Amino acid sequence: MLNLIVVVLPILAAVTWVVFNIQKPAREQLARQFDENNKAF
């Protein structure tokens, strides 16, 4: 059981880190797009 946790935890941390790093720039780009749309109106 402990062995499983030792293996799964770093994988889970890596996946979470990758997802967070991908979402961060995407969210900034989305916010920029909304700002441009608001200025257009």
UniProtKB/Swiss-Prot annotation:
A GO biological process of this protein is: photosynthesis
Q: How does it sit in the membrane?
A: Single-pass membrane protein
Main subcellular localisation: membrane
Q: Where do the TM regions start and end?
A: 4-22
Q: Where in the cell is it found?
A: Cellular thylakoid membrane
> Would the keyword DNA damage be found if you checked this record's keyword annotation?
no
Pfam families from the entry?
Answer: PsbY (PF06298)
Q: Which GO terms describe its molecular function?
A: manganese ion binding
Question: What domain of life is recorded for the organism?
Answer: Bacteria
Keyword list (alphabetical) reads:
Membrane, Photosynthesis, Photosystem II, Thylakoid, Transmembrane, Transmembrane helix
What GO cellular component is one of the record's annotations? plasma membrane-derived thylakoid membrane
Family statement drawn from the similarity comment of this UniProt entry: Belongs to the PsbY family.
Which NCBIfam families does the protein's record reference? Answer: PRK13240.1
Self-association state and partner proteins as the record states: PSII is composed of 1 copy each of membrane proteins PsbA, PsbB, PsbC, PsbD, PsbE, PsbF, PsbH, PsbI, PsbJ, PsbK, PsbL, PsbM, PsbT, PsbX, PsbY, Psb30/Ycf12, peripheral proteins PsbO, CyanoQ (PsbQ), PsbU, PsbV and a large number of cofactors. It forms dimeric complexes.
Reported function:
Loosely associated component of the core of photosystem II (PSII), it is not always seen in crystals. PSII is a light-driven water plastoquinone oxidoreductase, using light energy to abstract electrons from H(2)O, generating a proton gradient subsequently used for ATP formation.
Q: What is this protein called?
A: Photosystem II reaction center protein Y
Q: Which organism is it from?
A: Prochlorococcus marinus (strain MIT 9211)
Q: What is the lineage of its organism?
A: Bacteria, Bacillati, Cyanobacteriota, Cyanophyceae, Synechococcales
Gene behind this chain?
A: psbY
